[in-house]
Design a protein with these regions (language model features):
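Transmembrane beta-barrel strands of outer-membrane/channel proteins
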Residues: 48-54, 95-101, 142-148, 198-206, ...
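Short loop/turn motifs that connect adjacent beta-strands in outer-membrane beta-barrel proteins
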Residues: 22, 29, 37-38, 82-95, ...
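Outer-membrane pore/translocation modules
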Residues: 91-242, 303
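Outer membrane beta-barrel transmembrane domains
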Residues: 208-329
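Membrane-embedded beta-strand positions in outer-membrane beta-barrel channels/transporters
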Residues: 70-78, 123-125, 178-182, 233-239, ...
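Transmembrane beta-barrel domains of Gram-negative outer membranes and organellar outer membranes
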Residues: 22-130
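Boundary at the C-terminal end of the N-terminal hydrophobic targeting segment
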Residues: 18-20
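Sec-dependent N-terminal signal peptides
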Residues: 4-14
């Protein structure tokens, strides 16, 4: 699969060279193409969410959390490097970097309001979009991420309590480098009209033998955790945007975005086999389109079901998350 990724990356670069004649070239200019859908689990959109959870890791140091709301904060940015535009051939190509951070916070816990999990990721992305003359298919796109890094850490209160009080507690460091490839039909780009978009993608690890996580004997009380084996994930995403029709307008866009991803459910015990899990991430709501600033503000309902998506807790299934999300991007 790595050879396929490398071949695809080289092919995309060769296409850019061939299309380079009569093209416009820009440095550090936003291309707007192949941005993450709102429901993408590793989205770079800025979000503040207040939500209800049905469960957490069994080692969490308090057990009354189900009766209060939690906060999840997403901070992210995409930094453009290069943008090619060929108006005659209706073709766009861009290279950018991105970085984001996700915090899960027990904000209304009375003692310390602890950060439960910190997740950050960054990578390099190449994207290409070709517009076609079809009333239903506006464009076709390809996204290649030759490398991205993700790392997650549980909060100090969580880990200190677990290490001091729980005999079987282990702190697992989820940290890995991966690659990703995705194809899209009807990338939203700068389109503001009604549009149904679809994306499929796949990612794998560069170091398959290391897996998604490592352990330190000082943090696991000399217990071992087997390395992960099924080190890949894939997803399908659908994104519907409407500015014409019921309960929407040119300035108030209705968005329904959903991702179904198949991810590895971790196992830190030799006796328990790791397994795979289908997970759903759904956003439904509206965003206000600002023509002057180029940024949009939206209010959405979010629902997630599957394994806990946060780092070390990906060994826990049956997770439900429902709440309101204030989005700025």
């Amino acid at each position: 699969m790595k050879k396929i990724l490398l071949t695809s990356f080289l092919l995309s670069l060769s296409i850019v060279v061939l299309r380079g004649q009569n093209s416009e070239h820009y440095a550090f200019r936003n291309s707007h193409i192949l941005k993450p859908f709102l429901s993408e689990i590793r989205s770079t959109a800025n979000k503040v969410e207040i939500a209800s959870l049905n469960k957490l890791d069994d080692n969490y140091y308090v057990n009354d959390y189900a009766g209060r709301p939690f906060m999840e904060v997403h901070l992210g940015a995409e930094l453009p490097l290069y943008y090619l535009l060929n108006r005659q051939k209706k073709f766009k190509f861009s290279v950018s970097t991105y970085i984001a951070n996700i915090l899960l916070i027990d904000m209304f816990e009375e003692n310390t309001a602890p950060v439960i999990n910190t997740d950050y990721f960054f990578g390099l992305k190449a994207a290409a979009v070709k517009y076609v003359d079809n009333p239903y298919i506006r464009n076709l796109g390809l996204k290649l991420v030759p490398v991205f890094h993700e790392s997650t850490h549980i909060g100090d209160e969580f880990s200190i309590h677990g290490y001091d009080e729980l005999p079987g507690f282990r702190r697992v460091n989820v940290s890995y480098e991966a690659w990703e490839i995705a194809a899209v039909i009807n990338d939203p780009d700068t389109i503001k009209s009604n549009l149904l978009s679809a994306k499929v993608g796949f990612h794998g690890l560069w170091n398959n033998s290391k897996g998604y996580y490592t352990t330190d004997s000082l943090e696991t009380k000399n217990q071992t955790a087997p390395a992960s084996k099924k080190n890949y994930e894939y997803y399908i995403q659908m994104n519907l945007q409407r500015t014409q029709g019921f309960l929407c307008s040119d300035r108030l866009m209705n968005v329904i975005s959903v991702e179904a991803n198949n991810r590895l459910k971790f196992s830190y015990d030799e006796a328990v086999e790791e397994s795979r899990s289908w997970n759903i991430n759904l956003y439904v709501g509206w965003k206000y389109i600002s023509e002057k600033s180029g940024h949009n503000v939206g209010l959405f309902f979010r629902y997630y079901a599957g394994i806990i998506p946060n780092g070390q807790f990906r060994n826990t299934g049956g997770y439900r998350y429902a709440g309101l999300s204030l989005v700025y991007h």
